[in-house]
Amino acid sequence: MFTGIVEEVGTIKSINRGQHSAVLTVRAKTVLEGTRIGDSIAVNGICLTVRQLFPDSFAADVMHETLNRSALAQLTIASAVNLERAMPANGRFGGHIVAGHVDGVGRIANIRKDDTAIWYTIHADSAILRYVVEKGSITIDGISLTVAAVEPTGFSVSTIPHTVRQTNLNQRHKGDFVNLETDVVGKYIERLLPSETPKQNTLTKEMLLRCGF
């Protein structure tokens, strides 16, 4: 589990693409501290398992499903990526619950600056937007952010300059694709609630006759 508080911005050192998967090697520093093979690191919000460690980087496998569902396939050498190690049991919970399982991809439709904040408007599919609520949490490329407004085709977030400086948001432009993970709590609530679809009536004339009516 992660919190959406980015520890550092790494860079893609190499990408080895296979027919149905890829191996990413990411140049990093902070997230290598105490990390062992088999540990989890979120790369742009996607939970990846460390398969190899080097003095200045780590390598991780990316499966076919992840490549299809996320924006990782668009990474190139030297691309900046947000990195976060899995939260330890005694760690501080600074953001919100982030599983590292991306729901899909959004696209930056607009970037606007005002006196104190930078606003990002993200367009996304309706399947993602159904879980996006105003004042709720959302993860954009591994960054825990608060939804400022929800629109029919997307949503907006307001970020402080510190967040932009400490993440790869400072290298994002209009038209860029970003990984999105909605709040997992909403998904569980939806799953537990009774379905709104009425159950099919199984009472038939033949059944009534068999029962003596």
Where do the language-model regions lie?
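Conserved loop->alpha-helix
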Residues: 1-213
